[in-house]
């Protein structure tokens, strides 16, 4: 394992498409997780016409120790947000859109009705819709609101191995709770499910493989594995930088376990090349 940083090549944000998307989002006071979480793939994804919209505000009610999303005062939801997202996606002429959100533990339904309203509005565009959801405190009736809108993919991230969960994630999150969310989605539908694991927080390969088995047993179809990169000095330090060989070996292990599609590499994130995962995984709409 490498103790020091490896030269992970990241394209700097630039280009006409990038500038257009950034100005479109700013004009509508919309947020992307690409910006808020300091995603290293922002240039590549935006230039290819893909963006992950982050709804329900820019402040999160939780404080996971790996995440750069802010935790300030929780503001009221914008009732016009479903329309703003719809208009932005339409203007960008996207074929595949990813919607995620901050946690809103301050709201009675954890924001599930608002999240569902955004999906419902986007359905009018006849495009592929992937959602990366919070755990909604594990409450089934809140998760049902998302399932009932029938997005093409429902993702929820396990983030790390069982042993490190309490160190890495907010106390209100949980390893088993995340598995239960994914298991419940699959039990109620045939919607494609997806999750993600970060490397570099002190986990062992055996622990990662155990987590892959847990995710597969919960019915997860797609898994992504990426390197944790410390966003700012406020977040957890990187314990190790994994070489490409480690990502390749874990990808092979994941496929042998039975996942339909695996993306594994230093800069891979949950929504990275999401449309490709849908196509190469051999998935089809009902």
Swiss-Prot record:
Q: In which compartments does the protein localize? A: Cytoplasm
Query: Which residues take part in binding [4Fe-4S] cluster 1?
Result: 34, 39, 45, 271
The reaction(s) annotated as catalysed by this protein in its Swiss-Prot or TrEMBL entry are: [[Fe-S] cluster scaffold protein carrying a second [4Fe-4S](2+) cluster] + N(6)-octanoyl-L-lysyl-[protein] + 2 oxidized [2Fe-2S]-[ferredoxin] + 2 S-adenosyl-L-methionine + 4 H(+) = [[Fe-S] cluster scaffold protein] + N(6)-[(R)-dihydrolipoyl]-L-lysyl-[protein] + 4 Fe(3+) + 2 hydrogen sulfide + 2 5'-deoxyadenosine + 2 L-methionine + 2 reduced [2Fe-2S]-[ferredoxin]
Cite a GO CC annotation.
cytoplasm
Cofactor(s) needed, names only, are: [4Fe-4S] cluster
Q: Which domain of life is it from?
A: Archaea
The UniProt entry lists the main location of this chain as cytoplasm
Single GO molecular-function term? metal ion binding
This protein's UniProt keywords: 4Fe-4S, Cytoplasm, Iron, Iron-sulfur, Metal-binding, S-adenosyl-L-methionine, Transferase
Q: Does the keyword Iron-sulfur apply?
A: yes
Q: Where is the Radical SAM core domain?
A: 46-260
Record has Iron-sulfur as a keyword:
yes
Involved pathway(s): Protein modification; protein lipoylation via endogenous pathway; protein N(6)-(lipoyl)lysine from octanoyl-[acyl-carrier-protein]: step 2/2
Q: How is the cofactor bound?
A: Binds 2 [4Fe-4S] clusters per subunit. One cluster is coordinated with 3 cysteines and an exchangeable S-adenosyl-L-methionine.
Q: What is its EC number?
A: 2.8.1.8
**EC class:** transferase
Kindly give the InterPro entries that the UniProt entry links to this protein. Aldolase_TIM, Elp3/MiaA/NifB-like_rSAM, Lipoyl_synth, rSAM
- Residues recorded as binding [4Fe-4S] cluster 2, renumbered to this chain, are 60, 64, 67
Alphabetized HAMAP family for the sequence: Lipoyl_synth
* Family, per entry: Belongs to the radical SAM superfamily. Lipoyl synthase family.
What's the name of the protein?
Lipoyl synthase
Q: Give the organism the record lists.
A: Picrophilus torridus (strain ATCC 700027 / DSM 9790 / JCM 10055 / NBRC 100828 / KAW 2/3)
- What gene is behind this protein? lipA
